Curated annotation (Swiss-Prot):
Keywords: Bacterial flagellum biogenesis, Chaperone, Cytoplasm, Translation regulation. It is found in: Cytoplasm. One of its GO terms (cellular component) is cytoplasm. The lineage of its organism: Bacteria, Pseudomonadati, Campylobacterota, Epsilonproteobacteria, Campylobacterales. GO terms for biological process: bacterial-type flagellum assembly; regulation of translation. It comes from Helicobacter hepaticus (strain ATCC 51449 / 3B1). Interacts with translational regulator CsrA and flagellin(s). Belongs to the FliW family. Acts as an anti-CsrA protein, binds CsrA and prevents it from repressing translation of its target genes, one of which is flagellin. Binds to flagellin and participates in the assembly of the flagellum. InterPro entries: Flagellar_assembly_factor_FliW (IPR003775), Flagellar_assmbl_FliW_dom_sf (IPR024046). This is Flagellar assembly factor FliW 1. SUPFAM superfamilies: BH3618-like. Coiled coil: none annotated.
Length: 146
């Protein structure tokens, strides 16, 4: 699906339309619908950890979230090898409104959200043993870690 960018992705202020493709329940691809860059791997944060934040009023207005029922929150992941070294930006989530095909990036204040990081390793949540068995990587919640 192609989304109109209402509040730009940091560093890519001139990008107006982005295409979102689902890979599986955890991963998605997002790329410029009108050019070659940028392209990102996104993750569903809710499959990895408890994740919650307040959406700023300006973003609610831009995306017309008052009556929206079909929303997606995703975070950008920087891919590394091995995969458990890949990092997730939990401080700048992307919000997608499927009702009107708009999207925006929200930049959270780290002082208000001290448990979120710009570059948190997915290895904190990623079950490497399951991945090595050839199965889809099983998310590991903090409560499951020893």
């Amino acid at each position: 699906m192609i989304f109109e960018v209402k509040s730009p992705i940091l560093g890519f202020e001139s990008v107006a339309k982005m295409k979102l493709e689902k890979i599986d329940d955890l991963f998605m691809k997002l790329y410029n619908a009108e050019g070659e860059v940028p392209h990102f791997t996104l993750v569903n944060p809710f499959l990895l950890r408890e994740y919650e934040f307040d959406v700023p009023a300006s973003i609610k207005i831009l995306l017309d979230l008052s009556d929206a029922k079909n929303l997606l929150i995703a975070n950008i992941m920087v891919i590394q090898q091995p995969i458990e070294n890949s990092t997730i930006n939990f401080l700048a989530p992307l919000i997608f409104n499927f009702d009107n095909l708009t999207m925006a990036q929200v930049v959270l204040d780290s002082t208000q959200y001290p448990l979120y990081s710009l570059n948190e390793p997915i290895g904190k949540y990623y079950d490497k043993e399951e991945a090595q068995k050839g199965e889809q990587a099983a998310p590991v919640r903090d409560s499951q870690k020893k």
